[in-house]
A protein has these predicted regions:
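A structural signal for multi-pass alpha-helical bundles of membrane permease subunits
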Residues: 3-294
Length: 294
């Protein structure tokens, strides 16, 4: 290995720059979490005071509840829908490439454009959904003013964007399963439903675990969705809508750090949220691993 020191020396500037610009801000944010800093004046060390205030901050816990509920409402249908679509697409013989691209397009579409589209579709007064409901005699639904429906709309937006991404991953896993396994199951009299739950799901467990972890991380990082969704209302743009029903933790971090210039408190928010994400990822991992062993 030492014989290649010249080669390592040649590529070392890239890794040094990468380390500085990647891990430097991470450690600096941890440093800020123990400081009171408004971005202009001198920093003041306050120890764990930021985290103590965070623990007693009702808005922080509201943002945590909103984030977790949106995560559940989006992750479950996303993964289930992706697995169903991948299974159906796996059995398609014609136009498979077209369907694959069409279902994946939402994931590469600008999240701002998608949020604006959903805001127009679910608008309380002029939305497409309420217009359709009106044709069958149903009164307009307050999609963007009801606390629960706000979360449903944000979850639907995230589901629409990420289902295709997970579907591609599941489809790759399905294509790697030998056809001989399905042929043997068919000879034993197993129907499609039994084959799906007793063969496809067990074989796909490692891939499902991967998508659960990735979806957990992505689902908990919702920020642009509620911000852009309420961008037309200046009073609610960075508050998560009426009653802060769509205020996610990252949106609260943005509000605290960049709108109120409380960078120390903003850093404390993201580090507390980082710990929460790690805990949830570990719990998901344990649950899936336990199911795999059983």
């Amino acid at each position: 290995m030492l014989s290649y020191w010249r080669q390592y020396l040649a590529i070392s500037p890239f890794y040094l720059i990468f380390t500085v610009f990647s891990f430097g801000p991470v450690f600096y944010s941890l440093y800020l979490a123990f400081q009171r800093y408004d971005g202009l004046g001198a920093k003041q060390f306050v120890g764990l005071q930021q985290f103590e205030f965070l623990w007693n901050d009702p808005v922080f816990w509201l943002s945590i509840r909103n984030t977790l509920l949106i995560w559940v409402l989006s992750t479950v249908p996303t993964l289930f829908g992706a697995l169903v679509l991948a299974t159906l697409l796996h059995s398609v013989r014609r136009f498979k490439g077209f369907y694959r691209i069409a279902l994946y397009v939402p994931n590469v579409t600008s999240i701002v454009a998608v949020a604006i589209f959903f805001g127009a579709v679910f608008s309380n007064n002029f939305g497409l959904v309420n217009a359709i409901l009106g044709t069958v005699g149903i009164s307009p639904v307050p999609w963007l003013s009801n606390p629960w429906l706000i979360k449903v709309v944000i979850a639907a937006l995230m589901t629409w964007m990420w289902t295709g991404y997970n579907m591609i991953i599941y489809l790759a896993g399905l294509q790697a399963i030998p056809t001989s396994i399905y042929e043997a199951a068919k000879m034993d009299g197993a129907g499609p439903v039994r084959t799906f739950f007793q063969i496809t799901i067990p074989v796909m467990r490692p891939i499902i675990l991967f998508t659960v972890v990735i979806s957990t991380i992505n689902g908990l990082q919702s920020f642009s969705e509620p911000q852009v969704l309420f961008a037309s209302n200046a009073a609610n743009q960075n508050m998560g809508g009426p009653g802060q029903a769509g205020l996610t933790t990252l949106l609260y971090f943005y509000q605290s750090a960049f709108l109120l210039n409380d960078y120390g408190y903003g850093a404390a928010i993201v580090w507390a949220f980082f710990v929460l994400i790690i805990v949830l990822v570990v719990i998901n991992w344990r649950i899936v691993q336990r199911g795999r062993k059983s």
